[in-house]
């Protein structure tokens, strides 16, 4: 299920951003803007993988199946967030952070505290490193009215936010370690 969910999310990100990627020198050679994969074929890839994700989730257990539309909403929604919020990095963290809860639900069919704590840890960790990754596109984002923490707060502000997110991550690791 995880592979199909990731394929869906990655495919949708490339599909949704194809016109943005075509304008950015760093991403212009990605497969869709470069014409190696058609937008239509990318859309089919997304649809097939989303259906396979839902089918696999149903095979795992009923709760996983019931929550699969929510997971897909978060995974696909991330790709649109840079169009309206600088906090898109947090949404990416949430998209990846739901994996520990999803894995635990797949194995046990129930919720527990530890996977929720791990989700929080992954959210701050991924958000922190995505802010660093986004530094390379800060100027492009500003010029094209795209939202990101580096575009909104500048390089120094973004690094400060990334440091804070990483400090929270270290604290979460210590908290989880002392809890278990």
Provide a role label for each language-model segment.
Residues 1-3, 18-68, 143-180:
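Multi-pass membrane catalytic core of lipid/isoprenoid biosynthesis enzymes
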Residues 104, 110-166:
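Aromatic-anchored, glycine/proline-accented short structural segments
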Residues 17, 88, 137:
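Residue-level signature of catalytic and energy-coupling elements of molecular machines
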């Amino acid at each position: 299920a995880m592979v199909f969910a990731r394929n869906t999310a990655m495919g949708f990100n490339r599909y949704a951003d194809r016109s943005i990627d075509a304008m950015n020198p760093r991403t212009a050679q990605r497969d869709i803007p470069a014409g190696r994969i058609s937008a239509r074929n990318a859309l089919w890839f997304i649809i097939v993988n989303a259906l396979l994700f839902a089918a696999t989730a149903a095979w795992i257990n009923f709760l996983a199946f019931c929550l699969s539309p929510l997971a897909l909403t978060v995974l696909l929604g991330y790709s649109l967030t840079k169009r309206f919020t600088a906090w898109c990095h947090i949404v990416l963290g949430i998209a990846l952070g739901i994996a520990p809860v999803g894995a635990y639900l797949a194995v046990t069919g129930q919720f527990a505290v530890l996977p929720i704590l791990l989700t929080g840890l992954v959210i701050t960790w991924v958000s922190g490193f995505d802010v660093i990754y986004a530094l390379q596109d800060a100027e492009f984002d500003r010029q094209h009215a795209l939202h990101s923490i580096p575009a909104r707060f500048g390089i120094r502000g973004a690094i400060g936010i990334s440091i804070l997110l990483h400090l929270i991550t270290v604290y979460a690791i210590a908290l989880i370690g002392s809890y278990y």
